């Protein structure tokens, strides 16, 4: 089969929701395909029935679209020319290929029970072989026992690897990689439950869909020689492989599900009201850089600039501060009506306009704006630990409650500084603490005004 058109794919399992690692993989495959005017495909690897999560497939597809990663083909918009887009719908196709391998003598039925496999593994460990390699000559059972296990269907099917054979590929990211068959051993292609294993099914899928390039995480490097074995056994052209760098936290430690220093699922960002392209823009620069080292890029720019030769093999740090820097940049461009819709506030439009004008410049997500809004919608009146000093007393004296406006508040702040000969933090911090109950915040006069005259009067009520 001659592959001329660039076709890439993202093939998640519906065993969980879209993770930043999976999203980065999908994005790179999308950008790569579109850079070369090719096709980007999403298919679902759902043969691990026990681990599939309800809503897992929908989460993958919906969140990809939210990130503005649109597949040319998927379970939602399949192309019948390339077969099914869910592995669970392709079992007959996998069995067809297995029969070919069995007839060629390139695969065989293995009748080992779980107990016998564990015994074989224990014997290898006793010999100092800690990476298990199946020995096809280990099991000694009678023909009668074989017939019994055949009837009971208690067997798996393994691929028969050639002796001392090198599987090698020129990795797009890491260069030439070579693995010998003696370091792999015959591996299972059809499990005893008659479902295909990942490393077998994925090759059939990639061949059927004419995938030209496979970009995926570095954890798949050990899978690649196994997959090459299937390509060679079937006499199929193999795709170009590229294994993307690991994503770590800001300290360089591999991400784990218990690591709360990073928002790890795309749905978290969606729920928190991040602008979707902020995430995509940041993910695009985890393991890849443009020649001009530009950081803010539209989708069109990324597609144009996505040179695979600039993929990095060094681990990429996911820094929430940097992520929020992107969030802040893109939030400034959002349509104000979207903000109103997300905030769901009963405040009048004029007040909301000023609130957004005041808090938006420092916000990185809509949920952050909503948190600030709650402080104004449900304000505390007293905060006992607030210390009242001369600055606050003078500010209260200078504040004109009869003409309560942003301008009058600013004049009161300025006059207080002049009267007491103070400025900077010594001026602003006591006033901010006494009026807003916060150490930090946006432009002080606006932050005070948004609470309204009555709340500020009550908060300054005990100041004499």
From Swiss-Prot:
Swiss-Prot/TrEMBL GO biological process terms: glutamyl-tRNA aminoacylation
Annotated ATP binding sites: 257
Keyword Protein biosynthesis part of the UniProt annotation: yes
An annotated GO cellular component: cytosol
Compartment(s) of residence: Cytoplasm
UniProt motif 'HIGH' region: location: 12-22
Reaction it catalyzes: tRNA(Glu) + L-glutamate + ATP = L-glutamyl-tRNA(Glu) + AMP + diphosphate
InterPro entries the UniProt entry points to: aa-tRNA-synth_I_cd-bd (IPR045462), aa-tRNA-synth_I_codon-bd_sub2 (IPR020751), aa-tRNA-synth_I_CS (IPR001412), aa_tRNA-synth_I_cd-bd_sf (IPR008925), Glu-tRNA-ligase_bac/mito (IPR004527), Glu/Gln-tRNA-synth (IPR000924), Glu/Gln-tRNA-synth_Ib_cat-dom (IPR020058), GluQ/Sye (IPR049940)
Pfam family, one: Anticodon_2
Primary location class: cytoplasm
Molecular function via GO: ATP binding; glutamate-tRNA ligase activity; tRNA binding; zinc ion binding
The keyword Nucleotide-binding belongs to this UniProt entry's keyword annotation: yes
Keyword terms: Aminoacyl-tRNA synthetase, ATP-binding, Cytoplasm, Ligase, Nucleotide-binding, Protein biosynthesis
Motif ('KMSKS' region): 254-258
EC number: 6.1.1.17
PANTHER family, alphabetized: GLUTAMATE--TRNA LIGASE, GLUTAMATE--TRNA LIGASE, MITOCHONDRIAL-RELATED
Stated family: Belongs to the class-I aminoacyl-tRNA synthetase family. Glutamate--tRNA ligase type 1 subfamily.
Record note on quaternary structure: Monomer.
Primary role: Catalyzes the attachment of glutamate to tRNA(Glu) in a two-step reaction: glutamate is first activated by ATP to form Glu-AMP and then transferred to the acceptor end of tRNA(Glu).
Protein name (database record): Glutamate--tRNA ligase
């Amino acid at each position: 089969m001659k592959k001329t058109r660039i076709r890439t794919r993202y093939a998640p399992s519906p065993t969980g929701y879209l993770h930043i690692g999976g999203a980065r993989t999908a994005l790179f495959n999308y950008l790569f395909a579109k850079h070369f005017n090719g096709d980007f495909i999403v298919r679902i690897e759902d043969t691990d029935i026990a681990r599939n999560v309800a809503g897992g497939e929908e989460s993958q597809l919906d969140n990809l679209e939210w990130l503005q990663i649109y597949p040319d083909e998927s379970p939602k918009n399949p192309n019948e020319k390339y077969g099914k887009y869910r592995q669970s719908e392709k079992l007959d196709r996998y069995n067809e290929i297995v029969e070919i391998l069995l007839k060629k003598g390139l695969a065989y039925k293995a009748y080992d029970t779980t107990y016998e496999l564990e015994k074989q593994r224990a014997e290898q460990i006793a010999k100092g072989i800690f990476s298990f390699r199946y020995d096809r000559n280990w099991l000694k059972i009678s023909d009668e026992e074989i017939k019994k296990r055949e009837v009971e269907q208690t067997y798996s099917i393994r691929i028969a690897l050639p002796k001392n054979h090198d599987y090698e590929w020129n990795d797009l990211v890491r260069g030439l990689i070579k693995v010998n068959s003696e370091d792999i051993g015959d591996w299972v292609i059809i499990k005893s439950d008659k479902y295909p294993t990942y490393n077998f099914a994925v090759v059939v899928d990639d061949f059927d869909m004419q995938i030209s390039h496979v970009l995926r995480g570095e954890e798949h490097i050990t899978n690649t020689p196994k997959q090459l074995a299937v390509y060679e056994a079937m006499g199929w052209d193999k795709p170009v492989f590229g294994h993307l760098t690991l994503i770590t936290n800001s300290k360089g430690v591999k991400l784990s599900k218990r690591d709360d220093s990073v928002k790890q699922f795309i749905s978290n960002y969606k729920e928190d009201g991040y602008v979707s392209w902020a995430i995509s823009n940041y993910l695009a620069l985890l393991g890849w850089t443009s020649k001009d080292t530009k950081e803010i890029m539209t989708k069109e720019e990324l597609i144009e600039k996505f040179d695979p030769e600039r993929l990095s093999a060094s681990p990429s740090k996911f820094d929430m501060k940097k992520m929020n820097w992107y969030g802040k940049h893109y939030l400034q461009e959002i349509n104000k009506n979207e903000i109103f819709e997300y905030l769901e506030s009963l405040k009048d439009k004029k007040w909301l306009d000023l609130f957004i004008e005041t808090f938006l410049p420092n916000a990185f997500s809509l949920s952050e704006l909503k948190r600030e809004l709650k402080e104004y919608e449900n304000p505390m009146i007293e905060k006992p630990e607030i210390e009242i000093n001369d600055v606050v007393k003078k500010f209260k004296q200078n504040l004109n409650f009869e003409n309560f406006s942003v301008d009058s508040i600013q004049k009161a702040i300025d006059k207080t500084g002049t009267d007491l000969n103070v400025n900077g933090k010594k001026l602003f911090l006591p006033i901010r603490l006494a009026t807003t109950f916060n150490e930090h915040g946006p432009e002080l006069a606006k932050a005070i005004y948004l609470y309204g005259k009555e709340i500020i009067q009550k908060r300054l009520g005990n100041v004499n």
